[in-house]
Amino acid sequence: MSIPHINKLSQDGRVRFSNWAKTFSAISLGLRCPKTEEQLREILVDANSNGKKIRVVGAGHSPSDIVCTSGYLLSLDKMNKVVSFDPDSLSITVQAGIRFYQVQEILQNLGYSLPIVGSISETSVSGIMSTCTHGSSLQHQVLPHYIKSMRIMLADGSIVTCSRELQKDMFAAAQVSLGALGVIVDITISVVPAFDLVATEDVTTVTDLFQDWKNNLIWESAEFVRVHVFPYANRAVVWRANKVEPNTVPHTPKPSLFRLKLDSFVYQCLLFVGKCVNRVTPYLERFWFKCHYGSKLGTALQVAGPGFDVLQMFCYFSQHVSEWGIPLESAPDALEKLINYTVDDAGKIGAYTHWPIEVRVCAPTPEDECWLSTDCKVPTCYIEAIMYRPFSTSINYKPYFKALEDIANQYNGKPHWAKEYSLTKEQLLERYPNLSKWLSLRKLLDPKGVFWNDYLQRHLG
């Protein structure tokens, strides 16, 4: 089996894993690709009996070392079927290895849709849920909230079925499992009738963004909202989208792949110039922004199409990413501090930042579920910093990420599990009231640490 981010190194089976961005890699003992539950059971029982380590690997999109292991990688790509679809209960059951976009394609043909998605959909269903992916809407929670039930194979080969009604603690822990409790075999997810979205992009100044935020004219102004902030250009782009009935509004043609690739190439060229001559980075951001949005404020773009398609974003190229969830009421202060750092402080240490700062939101999950959800159990704002690697070159991203982390820590921020952060178990225990219960359950389910790795040891060990 050929997986793009996994390369065979030798005849003894060793492989090198690299994540999509090629920012993290590891040499593993081998790759296992079961097709059936019985094959999966044999792999896990062997690992459990012989002291082997296993980490499940999917599309490799996590911008961290959460997958990396010196043990064995386990790909569920061949366990990627739809198990059942039930329109009466508005649910679909799929095997864990299926990609999110594949689920949506099947649902769309049936006249249904996933309720909300993140920015990309090439990731596996189990990976999306296990790391607490989210979209951007105060009317929707993180994606694991929409899980109805799961079947999980433990390290000893036994299978546990859990839901809100059955094995409640197991379910609350496994909604965001970090791949540390067992291997998700299949998963039942809520669906909704298909919908289209009409989306607009509005250009505003940073000052006006904060004023509109204060007046509840941003996050409450549409069902789906996200904001991109361009600190050096003193601009923000507010993306809003609302549902309409399918095919009631003409669909906007998608940008051609050539145009996207060309834009990506030009973007890399600009950032590479900024890498070589760091002080010109603010001018490059202003130039890029003007080329894309012009000089005028107001509506810059309107598009319409199937909801799933409109919610997706084009992922340009290799990047480092850090994202933090903080209470929405504290977010304007936090964002203003990050903007001030970018404009006033980053250049003084020769560490100008890339653009944009992405800002998203979600509704709170109930207290008794999603123990490791990155929402704050109140309306939550996610602030994300991106530092690109133009033409795969190294970039000085750590000062920017430390600044964001220091700011987020002032509000007891929660880091995205699959992105870069430095918190330890002691710090995370203060922010996750149920983390101690999660850790105890993990030890009970996997006493030999089959699914443990360096990432988990660093942050939770």
Curated annotation (Swiss-Prot):
All copies of domain FAD-binding PCMH-type, residue ranges: 24-194
GO BP terms: dehydro-D-arabinono-1,4-lactone biosynthetic process; vitamin metabolic process
Enzyme Commission number(s) from the entry: 1.1.3.37
Modification Pros-8alpha-FAD histidine occurs at: H61
Record GO terms (molecular function): D-arabinono-1,4-lactone oxidase activity; FAD binding
Cited Gene3D superfamilies: 3.30.465.10, 3.30.70.2520, Uridine Diphospho-n-acetylenolpyruvylglucosamine Reductase, domain 2, Vanillyl-alcohol Oxidase, Chain A, domain 4
Pathway: Cofactor biosynthesis; D-erythroascorbate biosynthesis; dehydro-D-arabinono-1,4-lactone from D-arabinose: step 2/2
A GO cellular component entry from the record: mitochondrial outer membrane
UniProt catalytic activity: D-arabinono-1,4-lactone + O2 = dehydro-D-arabinono-1,4-lactone + H2O2 + H(+)
Keywords recorded for this protein, A-Z: FAD, Flavoprotein, Membrane, Mitochondrion, Oxidoreductase
Cofactor: FAD
Listed InterPro entries: ALO_C, FAD-bd_PCMH, FAD-bd_PCMH-like_sf, FAD-bd_PCMH_sub1, FAD-bd_PCMH_sub2, FAD_lactone_oxidase-like, Oxid_FAD_bind_N, Sugar_lactone_oxidase
Entry keyword annotation includes Flavoprotein: yes
Compartments reported by the entry: Mitochondrion membrane
Cited Pfam families: ALO, FAD_binding_4
Similarity remark: Belongs to the oxygen-dependent FAD-linked oxidoreductase family.
Protein name: D-arabinono-1,4-lactone oxidase
